[in-house]
Structure formats: C-alpha cells, structure tokens
C-alpha cells in the first residue's frame, strides 16, 4: 500500500497540472442563442406552416393559376422545396436542392400584386400559428430580398 501512495500522489499531481489545458474555454461553454429555425419550432413547425401557406396560395383566385398545372406529386415537390428553403434560410440543418429563385420562377409571370398577395398569405399563416412578431419579422426579412428574383420573370 505504501508503494501505491507515491504513485497515486504523482498521478493526481500530473492530472492537476494538465487538466486546465483540457478544460473548455469560457466562450465555448457559453450557449449560442437559438437560431430562428429553433425558435420557430424546427422542421415539423416549418412543415405545418408550409402546408397552410401552400393551401392558401393554391386556393386564392389570384394565385391558384401557379398550382393548376401541377399534379399531387408536383405540389409535394414544391412543398418540400419550400420547407427546405425556409429551413436553410432560418438557420436550420436542411439542404435546399431546388433551382435558384430566378430559374424556378422564370416564365411564371409573377407580378408585384402576386408577390404582395403571397406575403399577405404568409403573414396570415404565421399569425395562425401564433408566431411572435420578432420571429415573423425575421422570416419576412429573410424572404423579402428574393422579390427581385421572383417578380417579373
């Protein structure tokens, strides 16, 4: 037992000497603020918002023409692209694999009025899901720069 005591003391002293080098720096321990994606509720919440939003667009007399040429699979594909895009745009882990906005909307003849109607539907959807004003504003700020790539193509 006496032979283990010096070894044990040496081991503890060595550990105490090197332990600070393995400790996480204070900035690594600090929590990152949650992303917009997380604050919105993650993937399932974005999927629910997308379903409601697309439902509104597809039944709006002004906008339903954009969905009339798509079968169920086509609408499902659009839905997935919207979810993936929103996920990525809000800091989520998704990968958007769709076309860039200009290419995807070329030839559709989307007008400023169509854009405005779509934004109103998005706001109504976010309100339906009781998205707080701060997060709603961040979502709208994330999509507003896309207007130039979508309208008038």
Predicted features by range, described:
Residues 1-4:
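Positively charged n-region of N-terminal signal peptides that target proteins for export
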Residues 8-20:
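Bacterial N-terminal signal peptides
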Residues 22-24:
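Signal peptide cleavage region of secreted peptide precursors
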Residues 26-153:
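Core of compact, soluble alpha-helical bundle domains
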């Amino acid at each position: 037992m006496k032979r283990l005591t010096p070894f044990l003391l040496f081991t503890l002293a060595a550990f105490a000497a090197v332990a600070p080098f393995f400790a996480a720096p204070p900035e690594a321990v600090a929590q990152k603020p949650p992303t917009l994606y997380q604050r919105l509720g993650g993937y399932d919440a974005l999927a629910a918002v997308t379903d409601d939003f697309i439902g509104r667009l597809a039944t709006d007399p002004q906008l339903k023409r954009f969905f009339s040429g798509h079968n169920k699979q086509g609408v499902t594909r659009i839905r997935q692209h919207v979810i993936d895009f929103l996920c990525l745009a809000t800091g989520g882990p998704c990968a958007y694999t769709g076309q860039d906005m200009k290419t995807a909307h070329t030839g559709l003849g989307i007008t400023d009025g169509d854009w405005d109607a779509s934004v109103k539907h998005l706001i109504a959807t976010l309100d339906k899901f009781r998205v707080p004003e701060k997060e709603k504003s961040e979502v709208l700020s994330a999509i507003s720069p896309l207007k130039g790539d979508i309208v008038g193509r």
